[in-house]
């Protein structure tokens, strides 16, 4: 910690980079809170960028942790709206969101903003039909709205003229060179 404090005070970039590398090497989901606070204190943005990228690229793994369940609605929505998010399927993502919600039902106020970022249009018609039977989905009207929009997309797709929306776009990052 003394090296980090001195490096920050003297603005020795090479030493700060080494400290960032060291913190990144220690970073896990379990200790992220503490290490990210240290990185934030010393403006080690590479550490927070690394952690964000780690979550985005291993999101399915992240959803199995206590740290996922501890996210606020705005934090979760921030990850979900990112096109760099890697998920096995949007259905698996929906199920993870329901686990997150059931962990603390006071999050009902955040559920609309979180579900807004699920790409329901990428689910199959069978998956959408199953979701409409889900008790939680039936009681939360915004979810039904998103599902019905996705069903409309599939109907239009079958006719050959789908209206493309964020809900039907594949998650991908376009790099400019």
Please annotate each region the language model reported.
Residues 1-177:
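Alpha-helical scaffold in the C-terminal half of BTB/POZ domains
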């Amino acid at each position: 910690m003394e090296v980090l404090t001195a490096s920050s005070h003297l603005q020795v970039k090479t030493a700060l980079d080494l400290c960032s590398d060291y913190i990144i090497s220690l970073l896990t989901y379990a200790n992220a809170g503490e290490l990210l606070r240290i990185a934030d204190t010393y403006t080690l943005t590479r550490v927070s960028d690394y952690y964000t990228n780690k979550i985005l690229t291993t999101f399915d793994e992240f959803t199995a942790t206590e740290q996922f369940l501890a996210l606020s609605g705005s934090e979760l929505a921030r990850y979900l709206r990112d096109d760099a998010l890697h998920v096995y399927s949007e259905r698996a993502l929906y199920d993870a969101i329901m686990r997150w919600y059931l962990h603390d039902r006071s999050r009902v106020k955040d559920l609309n903003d979180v579900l807004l970022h699920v790409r329901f249009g990428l689910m199959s018609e069978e998956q959408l039909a199953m979701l409409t039977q889900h008790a939680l989905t039936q009681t939360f009207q915004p979810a039904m709205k998103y599902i019905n929009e996705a069903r409309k997309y599939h109907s239009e797709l079958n006719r050959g003229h789908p209206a493309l929306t964020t809900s039907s776009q594949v998650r991908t990052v376009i790099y400019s060179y």
